[in-house]
Amino acid sequence: VIVLDTSAVVAILGDEPDAAELTDRATLALATVMSAGTALELSIVVLSKWGPDGLVHLDALLRELRTTVRPVDEAQVRAGTEAYRCYGRGSGHPARLNFGDCFAYALARSLGAPLFFKGDDFVHTDIAPAHPA
């Protein structure tokens, strides 16, 4: 199982240059999971970029990737709080995680699962990537 971050899903939906490669990597996973917090962040980003049609494409992609949305529990709240303390914007750390990033980090930490993301924020944390950096 791998944990999805908003960044990778937006790259796929936005047909960025590496979208096909990201899709291939994600579909190789037996299953994908996403924090409810990430799901909300992702839906808001998709809605603002592509409108209601974007949400239709998002739902189809998440079905294709066999994605399960997991509720945020107390352990994730603690892990997300610690992530923001150590790696958040304003901490001085190069990861500069934002609020939404902390949901993905917390779920990956609580499951001991790798995180599927795009960009250079999570590479500066202690979370294992689900793909080569």
Segments from the language model and where they lie:
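Short loop->beta-strand "edge-of-pocket" segments that line small-molecule binding or catalytic clefts
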Residues: 2, 30-33, 65-70, 114
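Glycine/charged-rich beta-loop-alpha catalytic/anionic-binding loops adjacent to active sites
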Residues: 23-24, 60-63, 85-91
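Acidic active-site catalytic centers that drive phospho-/nucleotidyl reactions
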Residues: 5, 101, 119-121
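Short, well-structured N-terminal submotif of metal-dependent ribonuclease cores
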Residues: 1-34, 47-60, 124
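Active-site neighborhoods of divalent-metal-dependent phosphate/nucleic-acid chemistry enzymes
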Residues: 68-114
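Acidic, PIN/NYN-like endoribonuclease modules and their adjacent C-terminal/linker elements
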Residues: 105-133
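Active-site-proximal, substrate-binding regions of enzyme catalytic domains
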Residues: 43, 50-75
